């Protein structure tokens, strides 16, 4: 029988805060954990060896919480997730980490974050290359439903999102990459991934068939095809979101990458190309490299397709 081991209100004192002043002293923190695990053997044997020792889980979490300073609750939560997946045979973890007495006068209770992740999703985060940091940072905005991954390559984003329960359609001109992506999805039993080899850069009057109001979200990472933007926006459902990141001209000027200047966005150009969307997030500047290496100059955008206003009768 599948089930969960639940640990509520595990409290400890740790150093977590954006400012050095907040980190200078410990503060009360708490975490709730839900650990998914197959409980059949333990139920039949009544033997601790066949289950997860929640006392050891609690001890490990407290050790990590007390022994490491963190600027953000998010980084502390990642430390917990990494250790628990590495050291205990859990299938999925859901946690709620919070400051019990945050230094915000208007907050009378707690402030915190929740994270839910499967073992497969954790493994995919460690692939090379891993999912883009920008996608991970904006994951809380990603609406549930159907996603289109444009220029998907070997599927670092598609496989990750499918492991979280998303239905992901992928397109890429590289037939070998698409074949590898399809094979990787089958090997991981990810039935929510579909693949299509498609050249999006054919000359006019070619119009790519990406659908009409089909997707809840569209991802484009490190691929720039300016004539494609109207088709991307058309393919979004009203209320759907575009997640976009690629190089700016500063990266070409500083690093000569990409080699061709036309493959880079000019300053503010991404906002012009997505003017019909409502901007939920935009940042242009130096960001961590998409392979986790040295920083690169990119523009990052999350844009929402508005619902059409109803006309008055």
Show the residue positions of the predicted features:
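N-terminal, polar/charged subdomain of small-to-medium soluble alpha/beta proteins
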Residues: 1-127, 137, 150
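Conserved SAM/SAH-binding beta-strand->alpha-helix loop
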Residues: 174-176
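Conserved SAM-binding strand-loop segment of SAM-dependent methyltransferases
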Residues: 189-202
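A short acidic, Gly/Pro-enriched loop at the edge of an enzyme's catalytic core
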Residues: 206-217
């Amino acid at each position: 029988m599948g089930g969960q081991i639940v640990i509520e209100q595990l409290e400890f004192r740790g150093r977590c805060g954006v400012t050095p002043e907040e980190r200078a002293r410990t503060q009360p923190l708490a975490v709730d954990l839900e650990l998914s695990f197959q409980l059949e053997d333990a139920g039949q044997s009544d033997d601790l060896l066949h289950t997860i020792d929640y006392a050891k889980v609690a001890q490990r979490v407290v050790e990590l919480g007390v022994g490491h300073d963190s600027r953000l609750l998010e980084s502390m939560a990642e430390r917990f997730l990494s250790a628990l997946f590495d050291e205990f045979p859990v299938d999925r973890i859901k946690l709620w980490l919070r400051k019990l007495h945050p230094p915000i006068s208007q907050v009378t209770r707690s402030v915190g974050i929740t994270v839910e992740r499967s073992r497969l999703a954790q493994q995919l985060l460690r692939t090379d290359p891993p999912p883009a940091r920008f996608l991970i940072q904006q994951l809380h905005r990603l609406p549930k439903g159907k996603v289109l991954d444009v220029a998907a390559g070997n599927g670092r984003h598609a496989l990750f999102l499918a492991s979280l329960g998303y239905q992901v359609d992928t397109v890429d001109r590289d037939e070998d990459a698409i074949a590898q992506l399809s094979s990787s999805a089958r090997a991981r039993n990810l039935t929510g991934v579909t693949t299509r080899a498609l050249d999006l850069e054919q000359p006019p009057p070619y119009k790519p068939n990406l659908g009409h109001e089909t997707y809840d979200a569209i991802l484009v990472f490190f691929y720039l095809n300016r004539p494609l933007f109207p088709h991307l926006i058309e393919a979004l459902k009203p209320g759907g979101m575009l997640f976009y990141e690629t190089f700016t001209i500063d990266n070409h000027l500083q690093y000569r990458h990409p080699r061709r200047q036309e493959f880079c966005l000019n300053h503010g150009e991404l906002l012009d190309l997505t003017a019909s969307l409502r901007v939920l997030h935009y940042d242009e500047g130096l960001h961590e490299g998409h392979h986790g290496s040295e920083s690169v100059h990119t523009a990052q955008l999350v844009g929402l397709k508005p619902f059409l206003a109803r006309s008055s009768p």
